[in-house]
């Protein structure tokens, strides 16, 4: 078949160029990373800070691993270092929506339901960007909701970062795919510029308030 016989009507250099431009434009939009927001998680403090253009705007209590920090397979530890948001799962789902293997089960679990500890409400799936957290995505390291909200602020997870459902929904609705997530084993005030003093920060964290 000749090249002429496969040429589409209107397939001029101008038309082809316009098509490629639009294709690249929409592909770029679909894959554009969130560079405005950053999340910093302190294992030491069991706290998470949300930054907007590097300015802290909210802090929340969290729960990291009961086994400490690390990233090897089967360790059930929370990885340290620079990561990014790879996927977001659970748009619009009611608080307490149960997920298994990142799929909704159809069940909704209440806060502090006795004997229940599934992943609930939303899933923010993290991908490691460094050697020290290269296994994070394969290990299914998430920021996710938990029914056991009474334990938030204590290290009781199996590697993930747990949040209260209401706090998680706030965070989920702000950050986009590609946003950086930094996990450190230091106090937040040591790594985030512009945080309030320790006493004010403690009040802010307990109440779940923003800190504009």
What do the PLM-derived regions correspond to, one by one?
Residues 34, 72-77, 93-212:
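Exported/periplasmic cell-wall-interacting domains
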Residues 11-20:
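Sec-dependent N-terminal signal peptides
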Residues 57, 61-93:
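Electropositive
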């Amino acid at each position: 078949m000749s090249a002429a016989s496969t040429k589409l009507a209107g397939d001029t250099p101008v038309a082809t160029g316009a098509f490629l431009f639009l294709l690249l434009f929409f592909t770029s939009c679909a894959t554009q990373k969130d560079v405005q927001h950053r999340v910093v998680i302190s294992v030491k403090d069991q706290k998470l800070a949300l930054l907007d253009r590097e300015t802290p705007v909210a802090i929340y209590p969290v729960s990291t691993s009961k086994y400490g920090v690390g990233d090897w397979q089967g360790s059930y530890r929370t990885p340290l270092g620079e990561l990014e948001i790879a996927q977001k799962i659970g748009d619009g789902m009611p608080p307490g929506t149960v997920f298994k293997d990142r799929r909704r089960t159809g069940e909704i679990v209440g806060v502090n339901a006795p004997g229940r500890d599934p992943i609930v409400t939303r899933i923010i799936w993290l991908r490691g960007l460094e050697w020290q957290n290269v296994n994070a995505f394969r290990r299914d390291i998430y920021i996710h909701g938990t029914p056991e909200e009474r334990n938030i602020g204590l290290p009781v997870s199996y590697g993930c970062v747990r949040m209260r459902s209401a706090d998680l929904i706030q965070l989920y609705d702000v950050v986009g795919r590609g946003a950086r997530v930094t996990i450190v084993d230091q106090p937040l005030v040591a790594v985030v510029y512009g945080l309030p003093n320790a006493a004010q920060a403690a009040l802010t964290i307990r109440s779940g308030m923003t800190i504009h």
